[in-house]
Swiss-Prot record:
Gene Ontology cellular-component terms listed: cytoplasm; small ribosomal subunit
HAMAP family on file: Ribosomal_bS16
Designated name of the protein: Small ribosomal subunit protein bS16
Residues in the signal sequence: none
Organism, scientific name: Chloroflexus aurantiacus (strain ATCC 29366 / DSM 635 / J-10-fl)
GO biological process: translation
Gene: rpsP
Gene3D superfamilies found in the cross-reference section: 3.30.1320.10
Keyword Acetylation: no
Protein family per UniProt: Belongs to the bacterial ribosomal protein bS16 family.
Annotated keywords: Ribonucleoprotein, Ribosomal protein
Superkingdom: Bacteria
GO molecular function annotation: structural constituent of ribosome
Amino acid sequence: MVKIRLRRTGKTKQPSYRIVVADSRSPRDGKFIETIGYYLPTRQPKVLEIKADRARYWLGVGAQPTEVVVKLLKRVNVLDEQGKVIAEA
């Protein structure tokens, strides 16, 4: 199964994350298929950048987002409150 999840990068106690599409059997920071964005939670304000078209594509072909990624996708209006994909505007 393919998952959309966070891949941890950054320094000790200064995490940053890449939002990646990866096989569910791969380790958290291991091999991935594609990077579709990044999230910097330690910056003020927090930085979130997602390629919405690629996220919609992967969701359309059956990739399952993790709980945290679902929240991030809702922030950038890729998913609605029910977790359904919003068509491009």
